[in-house]
Amino acid sequence: MNAIVLEQHTRNRRGGPARAPHVEGVRHRFVRTARLRMHVAEAGRGEPVLLLHGWPQHWYAWRDVIPLLARHYRVICPDLRGFGWTEAPRTGYRTGELVDDLIALLDVLALERVFVVGHELGGRLGFHLSLREPARVHGHLALNALHPYGSARRLAPQAWRQWWTVFVETPLLGRTVLRRLPAFTRLLFRLGNPNPDTRAASAVEQFIATLREPDRARAAERVQTQFAYRELVPTLLGKYRPTRLKVPTLMLNGTKDFALSPAGLGGYEPYADDLRVELVTDAGHFLPEERPRLVAETAHRFFSRLIERQSASQVPLTEATR
């Protein structure tokens, strides 16, 4: 199956602004998989690194990280189903289905194994990709993400932090709020980033612009609805605990993350072969935008260690890197 390469400014058949925001050195194309048509932003050469954005963003969330990582790696930033310039069908928004999209993308790009950096929703997908296809993920840097081993007992005390999800996970209400009340989305970004100096209002407006489209507002709602109504309780009751996490994983979280307290991240090392947690002082929920240099440096340090470990074992890191 071949990738379909289109011009950066071509309008997505399912919507999306006609013009993608510009980042120096970034190439854009649309890739047709067996599941849907995905927009992918790419830069650099070397070992492939898959950057998975959070909710309710798209590839542009990585705008300051991409140039830094592209010095050492081939950086691949897809828009997830329903976000940015990727198609936004009515169905397919469960975590497992979003992971299916990523596997299909890796297949089309002929990538046998990748590094993954996932933020928030993207971090959750990175965990589930690692659990399902450990041979395809060499290492995972999870930013501001809830791992699949969370327990109700440990997370219940911080349930109040999720007050905002009621407005976006409720069917019909969520899409209406996201589409017609941009002030709510702006509020989430302000709460998520405690440092005014690193807030980029123009970037927030890029994300809001796509949410004004009915299909994408519906998609953003359904991601939240599927997780809240179908996946959260089974996860907290231990659905994934019998499955050991074999992929080396580093979790990076801000100490001032309004949505996810560091207190709920530790204590799950027994479920994994190599799982560590690091905290970023005074940082919030949007690490790729608040601390892009730190994210890139942490990723490079982590991935370099894994490459050295692989080289020492004299086993090829990947069979297909383009």
Residue ranges with predicted function:
Residues 58-59, 124, 283-284:
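A short, glycine- and basic residue-enriched loop/turn
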Residues 41-85:
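Conserved HGGG/HGGXW glycine-rich cap/lid loop of the alpha/beta-hydrolase fold
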Residues 1-2, 321:
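N-terminal amphipathic/basic-hydrophobic helices that include classical n-h-c signal peptides
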Residues 273-322:
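Catalytic active-site module of serine/aspartate enzymes centered on a nucleophile-bearing elbow/loop
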Residues 60, 64, 263, 290-294:
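Generic recognition of short, well-ordered alpha-helical segments
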Residues 64, 71, 97-100, 104, ...:
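Alpha-helical macromolecular-interaction surfaces
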Residues 2-29, 35-40, 48, 76, ...:
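Flexible "cap/lid" subdomain of the alpha/beta-hydrolase fold that forms the substrate-access gate
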